[in-house]
Design a protein with these regions (language model features):
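Short, exposed coil/turn segments at beta-strand boundaries within extracellular/luminal domains
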Residues: 320-325
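Low-complexity, Pro/Ser/Thr- and charge-rich linker/hinge segments at domain boundaries
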Residues: 326-348
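Beta-strand-rich binding/interaction modules
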Residues: 248-288, 297-303, 310-319
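Extracytoplasmic/secreted cell-surface and envelope-processing proteins
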Residues: 24-27, 54-55, 365, 370-376, ...
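Catalytic beta-strand/loop cores that center a nucleophilic Ser/Cys/Thr
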Residues: 88-103, 371, 391-492, 509-547
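Aromatic-rich peripheral "rim/lid" segments of glycoside hydrolase catalytic domains that contact
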Residues: 38, 195-259, 266-268, 529-532
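Substrate-binding/catalytic cleft of secreted carbohydrate-active enzymes
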Residues: 1-210
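Short alpha-beta junction capping motif
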Residues: 340-388, 475-477, 481, 501
Length: 548
């Protein structure tokens, strides 16, 4: 028996009876009672994430491993920030609440009289690197990767495969960091577990690891960077937002999550620097954090009025050998940019055709309800675990299917983004923008055509998706924006994105080279897309329970 043969092993501290069981609680409790009678030195639980957490902690468990601490309103009982759409409204906290770094799970674990361990955090899909196919020289053959690669080729996107991999990989790391730090910020939290650090090529292909299936690095994060937010001691910045106006006072609390072997009494050095290096502030705080505690070291209060142009700032926190970073964006507090000579439209109609034929500059922001069949939903975080599996589960449960996208992809140096600092992939300033969008399916465009701002699709569909794209139509110039600019007008980043877009359209740089006839444009917006049948693998968990 396991307890008899391994009970004395120094690493044997905890035992659970399985993973995501739909267990008969009385039977499992009886088993644990027998185990304790045989060896009471260990900590026992009924299993990991049994009943998907809906039934909450049970008498007889020493600790509780779960994604949620029983049922509750919204996300009040969640101890993980990301879910499948079938399991939490809009995929959970990270996708559906405005990004901030000052929240934690204190409210959720208050419902539990024993330690809570977060279950299978950080399941963010990353687009695959198809060069790994060559590694499969044994009995396993990567038919799945070959199929996905062929689908990409069908839509003339093969040249972007490596870029897709890098962009989605770098964005997934930001989501890893946010998910983990939610746990580290929570006083009294029992910890969290990842499913693994590597891809899981089974169950429909869950490519969610920072390592590939061979345990090789994907090259998306340096070990020292990962260690900065997943270590025995983690410096934490507590901010109410990532996006600020230069008229707002910046307040940041600095905390430490201390799980080293002793108390931590060391200085915390901080620096806040703009990407161009012109604006810089720094300082030192003194930390005194008891072992096993999450405590504040002090705060940072600054004026941002010296930043007259849109800037990304990087905050670095260093104490001893531990270093962590944060990005925030500061935008000038200005009145909304005028449309000027740009004509704004919501539908394709005869008036719009005539304007384009006569040489007008047109901004088309399609009414989202009118293009559902030609687009996919707006989503911020990378799709959870595996699209085909949870698409099927959602449909069978009668619940919303995830939009299934992975990240934006753009050229940060393009003049469209001159006044909206960004990297090539999604980051926190894109949250409201992507959530209020419907990326257009552009498979019917010329094979080599690329949108100005693209969205990386999942491996099952591999659509060419456009968030912002442009065409020359007749004598006119057309820019199509699949983002509801009105919906994001009240946010610092939304107003700034609109400003950058309109300034581009009013400049000489706005000169589309991709010619499209009106008939082709009309077909793009009114032809239903032939969708590939996607059948997910069977999963035994019951996603029809719960209240979300």
């Amino acid at each position: 028996m396991l307890l008899e043969h391994f009970g004395n092993h120094p690493s044997f501290m905890m035992l659970g009876l399985g993973n995501e069981l739909d267990a008969e609680i009385d039977v499992v409790r009886e088993w644990l009672d027998d185990f304790r009678n045989l060896d009471n030195r260990h900590l026992y639980c009924f299993g990991s994430n049994n009943n998907l957490g809906w039934k909450g902690p049970q008498d007889g468990e020493d600790f509780f491993v779960t994604c949620r601490v029983g049922g509750g309103d919204g996300y009040t009982t969640h101890v993980r920030t990301s879910f499948a759409y079938v399991d939490a409204e809009k995929g959970g906290i990270l996708n559906n609440t405005r990004p901030a770094t000052d929240k934690d799970y204190s409210g959720a674990i208050a419902h539990c009289p024993r330690p809570v361990v977060g279950h299978e955090n950080c399941q963010f899909q990353i687009y695959p690197d198809y060069s790994q196919i060559e590694k499969y020289t044994g009995v396993l053959h990567p038919y799945n990767l070959e199929i996905f690669r062929d689908r990409l080729k069908e839509n003339h996107l093969s040249s972007q495969a490596k870029t897709f991999h890098q962009a989605t990989g770098h964005f997934s790391i930001e989501c890893y960091k946010a998910d983990m730090e939610y746990a580290f910020r929570t006083p009294g939290f029992g910890g969290f577990q990842l499913l693994d650090l590597q891809d899981y090529p089974g169950q429909g292909s869950a490519l969610v690891g920072i390592l590939d299936a061979f345990m090789d690095s994907k090259g998306i994060v340096a070990p020292e960077t990962f260690y900065g937010f997943c270590a025995p001691l983690v410096p934490l910045a507590l901010m109410k937002d990532h996006c600020w106006l230069n008229t707002q006072p910046l307040h940041i609390d600095v905390a430490l999550s201390n799980y080293v072997e002793g108390d931590w009494n060391e200085p915390v050095r901080w620096s806040l620097v703009s990407d161009n290096g012109v604006w810089k502030r720094d300082g030192v705080l003194m930390a005194s954090i008891p072992q096993g505690k999450v405590g504040k070291a002090g705060s940072i209060d600054l004026s941002l009025s010296g930043l007259k142009e849109a800037q990304r700032l990087t905050l670095t926190l260093t104490t001893g050998k531990y270093r962590n970073y944060y990005h925030l964006w500061v935008y000038p507090d200005e009145t909304a940019e005028s449309e000027g000579s740009v004509h704004v439209a919501s539908f394709l109609n005869d008036d719009l055709r005539k304007r384009l034929e006569s040489g007008a500059s047109v901004l088309l922001i399609p009414d989202h309800d009118s293009i559902v069949a030609q687009s996919v939903g707006g989503m911020f975080t990378p799709d959870y675990w595996n699209y085909s599996m949870f698409k099927t589960i959602s449909e069978n449960a009668g619940k919303e299917v995830s939009p299934g996208t992975l990240s934006i992809l753009t050229d940060p140096g393009h003049l469209l983004l001159k006044y909206f600092p960004t990297e090539c992939h999604s980051d926190w300033q894109w949250w409201s923008i992507t959530r209020n969008s419907r990326p257009m399916i552009l498979n019917a465009t010329r094979g080599e055509y690329r949108p100005l701002i693209q969205v990386v699709d999942n491996i099952e569909r591999n659509h060419k998706l456009g968030l912002v794209f442009e065409f020359a139509v007749g004598k006119g110039k057309l820019l199509v924006c699949m983002i509801d600019l009105q919906a994001i007008a009240g946010t610092p980043e939304g107003n700034q994105f609109r400003t950058s877009l309109l300034r581009y359209m009013k400049s000489d740089a706005f000169h589309p080279t991709e010619q499209l006839a009106w008939k082709e444009l009309d077909a793009l917006f009114h032809t239903d897309i032939n969708q590939r049948q996607i059948i997910g693998v069977k999963n035994e968990s019951d996603y029809t329970v719960g209240g979300e």
